[in-house]
Amino acid sequence: MPLPLGDPLALAVSPQLGYIRITAMPRWLQLPGMSALGILYSLTRVFGLMATANWSPRGIKRVRQSLYLRIHGCVMLIFVGCFSPFAFWCIFQRMAFLRQNRILLMIGFNRYVLLLVCAFMTLWIHCFKQAEIIGCLNRLLKCRRRLRRLMHTRKLKDSMDCLATKGHLLEVVVLLSSYLLSMAQPIQILKDDPEVRRNFMYACSLVFVSVCQAILQLSLGMYTMAILFLGHLVRHSNLLLAKILADAEHIFESSQKAGFWPNRQELYKGQQKWLALELWRLLHVHHQLLKLHRSICSLCAVQAVCFLGFVPLECTIHLFFTYFMKYSKFILRKYGRSFPLNYFAIAFLVGLFTNLLLVILPTYYSERRFNCTREIIKGGGLAFPSRITVKQLRHTMHFYGLYLKNVEHVFAVSACGLFKLNNAILFCIVGAILEYLMILIQFDKVLNK
């Protein structure tokens, strides 16, 4: 995904709004982060998720569509749709584990059928909404250019240009690491299953399922990167807002000290009118960022619902099987010993759950940044003396406050209208996994006394 990484510097923002300190970015962290971002961008093009004509993820140029990659995405959609039934049938015929009883067959349906359907839906969305996806990218870059023009200090501009911070690059590296870890279980099956060496199509089907999982995860990775960039813009919008309000407060203090000198008072009124204009332009950028946030979330809502259904089921099943093979009396009676922990399965769970965190938490923190804008306006507006405030600045502040008061209802974002992606849904997922895991463990203890 094309993102303007800017100068390789890291930013440290103090708790006091408006103060920014720029420090050098360590080389050892910059190179892995940039490489990971380039790999993610290339993978989205290879799997037909992005049809951009821009070959490099750097730069701030306008993103253009590529007809060749649009056709490539449609071919990927047709291939996944046609090959998915054959892939599941081949896996069902060769993987005897799935045919032992109905419970294991249901597990196979979750792992394979649900995943194949989710991958097909993901490619369908990316094929038929590619123009909207690229439009969101161009609107992000346009908002960045507009916001940068409003930055009237060198520190704010340097901070705006610097996206390659430690936190951002670390998030990119963690995202790529979660993809690698979530491929651990498919790699183990390809390595240990004897049927893989006997039947070539069975091996191809397993690889195909892994690719479908990667397609779903990469689509959500694009969402994470877009929210990361959007959060960067919102944070600097809040910094600029705090700076404007601080300048207005300084003007009021100077106006009160100047007394009744007419020339001085006219100068301060002119400065207030200029700040009112800057505040109005910032409000327009803030409105565009809110619309972008809603558009990006709606584009990835279906994929988020699919992933939030897939991950808890996989985590519950793998945790129970880890317990069953290690501590169940059924295994001890049948084999006389317990099996060691499956570290491939543990890595798979860690990768999936980390990926889930990187889908939910950036959305939650992005909404918190938008809520922070309301607090900044509220705190700054209280310091404005009404008798010396020009009507342009006063009316702009009132309009900004009313807009922020109502905007939460107008731009309410949810995943397909089902739930919000916040820390509450994360705690619900963890609680559901633990509850069903306890039920399965108690069920095993009752059956195998």
From Swiss-Prot:
Pfam families: 7tm_7
Stored InterPro entries: 7TM_chemorcpt (IPR013604)
Annotated membrane topology: Multi-pass membrane protein
Predominant cellular place of this UniProt entry's protein: membrane
Expression (tissue specificity): In larvae, is expressed in dorsal pharyngeal sense organ.
UniProt keywords, alphabetically: Cell membrane, Membrane, Receptor, Transducer, Transmembrane, Transmembrane helix
Residues on Extracellular side: 51-70, 126-205, 322-340, 444-449
Cytoplasmic membrane side: 1-27, 94-102, 229-298, 364-420
Superkingdom of the source species: Eukaryota
Any GO CC annotation of this UniProt entry: axon
Function summary: Probable gustatory receptor which mediates acceptance or avoidance behavior, depending on its substrates.
Record-stated family: Belongs to the insect chemoreceptor superfamily. Gustatory receptor (GR) family. Gr77a subfamily.
Name the UniProt record assigns to this protein: Putative gustatory receptor 77a
Organism for this UniProt entry: Drosophila melanogaster
Primary gene name: Gr77a
